[in-house]
């Protein structure tokens, strides 16, 4: 059945391709010397994704069907881990390194929170204690608020740096 092979699109946007080429999904090249810009883009996407992740966790708590939640939750888990792979490995600036570590921990938390919620929902019928654990789920919790603050801080720093660069070039 050689004639029936699937051909991959030339512009694949999988995490592996993005990480290997140092490009974002929009095709813009990441500057290795500007980890703050990369972290800002990653945090922006994570802020958008966390609303859907919150809905999946709340759906698991409400005992919505696994057939409905898993197709939504699985790609979220993969994308949160994929965003971690796109993170800069280290930052020279100690302040940026602190933000990088926080963002890495939050992305890991979000991926695991969705995965655990789906796993508990899948196994709930086995034990009453698992049902109590599902009842105790509280969305993404404090890390969701921390991600919002972290993104605001990254955006504010970037705006201040952009204005400083504009002023310096105008002089």
Protein language model annotation of sequence segments:
Residues 1, 14-18, 97, 117, ...:
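Intrinsically disordered, low-complexity segments enriched in charged and polar residues
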Residues 1-29:
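Short Lys/Arg-rich cationic patches that frequently serve as NLS/NoLS or arginine-rich RNA/DNA-binding motifs
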Residues 2-7, 68, 81, 170:
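Short, aromatic- and cysteine-enriched interfacial helices/patches
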Residues 6-9, 22-24, 152-171:
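Short, charged, intrinsically disordered terminal tails
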Residues 11, 15, 35-36, 96-99, ...:
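Short amphipathic alpha-helical segments that mediate assembly, nucleic-acid/protein binding
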Residues 31-94, 132-158:
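Alpha-helical segments in soluble extracytoplasmic regions
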Residues 61, 118, 122-129, 155, ...:
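Structured alpha-helical bundle/scaffold domains in large eukaryotic membrane-trafficking regulators
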Residues 79-83, 93-141:
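Long, amphipathic, charge-rich alpha-helical segments that form helical bundles/coiled-coils
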